[in-house]
């Protein structure tokens, strides 16, 4: 059952990639004369942007895919997962309350605990699934960084270069491949998301966009 759940996540990842490909195929539509002209942040054609997202995702996935065969390690993983009965039990209001109210192993990481609970529901103690979750979060952060830089500068290739450097830099290997570093990939994801939403807010400062920034 644990391997079955891991297979489902892999299928979900490739489904996302397939949706990106479909978006590329449909991005050639011709706009009428009344369509709004893109501003300087939309210099690169949409097809190129989606293609770059696809390339970044596939390259990062290919580089780190082997982590799905890796196991837990003895540094922090046993304390965080094996010896933590809250992680190894079902997600419940009691466990959610514990995640937000308790300082465990000397740290307070409520979102990390919740994400590990969800992993345990999906994969049990199949370490590969936990590693893949880290990888998916890292890929999403990479794509958000690319969107952010391209939106701010309008420069496709420079934005892609910086995003690729972020995705593939050796300093990030530990973060992606060590399950106990879930806190890092989670915080990076929400940081990138917050920056993207803030840029979105500055383009049209309305209250709902500002609330989205605060929530993220």
Residue ranges and their predicted role:
Residues 15-16, 20-216:
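Polytopic membrane enzymes that build or remodel cell-surface glycoconjugates and lipids
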Residues 3, 7, 26-28:
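Intrinsic-disorder-associated, low-complexity terminal segments enriched in Asp/Asn/His/Tyr and depleted
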């Amino acid at each position: 059952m644990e391997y079955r759940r891991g297979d489902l996540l892999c299928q979900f990842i490739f489904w996302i990639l397939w949706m990106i490909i479909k978006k590329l195929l449909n991005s050639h539509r011709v706009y009428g004369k009344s369509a709004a002209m893109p501003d300087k942040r939309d210099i690169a054609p949409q097809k190129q942007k989606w293609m770059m997202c696809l390339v970044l995702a596939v390259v990062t996935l290919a580089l780190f895919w082997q982590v799905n065969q890796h196991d837990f390690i003895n540094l922090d993983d046993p304390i965080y997962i094996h010896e933590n009965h809250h992680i190894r039990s079902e997600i419940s209001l009691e466990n959610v309350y514990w995640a937000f109210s308790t300082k465990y192993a000397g740290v307070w990481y409520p979102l990390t605990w919740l994400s590990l609970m969800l992993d345990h529901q999906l994969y049990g103690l199949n370490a590969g699934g936990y590693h893949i979750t880290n990888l998916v979060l890292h890929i999403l952060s990479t794509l958000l960084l690319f969107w952010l830089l391209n939106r701010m500068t309008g420069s496709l290739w420079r934005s892609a270069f910086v995003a690729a450097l972020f995705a593939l830099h050796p300093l990030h290997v530990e973060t992606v491949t060590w399950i106990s570093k879930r806190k890092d990939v989670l915080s990076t994801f929400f940081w990138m998301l917050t920056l993207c939403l803030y840029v979105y807010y500055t383009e049209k400062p309305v209250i709902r966009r500002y609330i989205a920034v605060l929530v993220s």
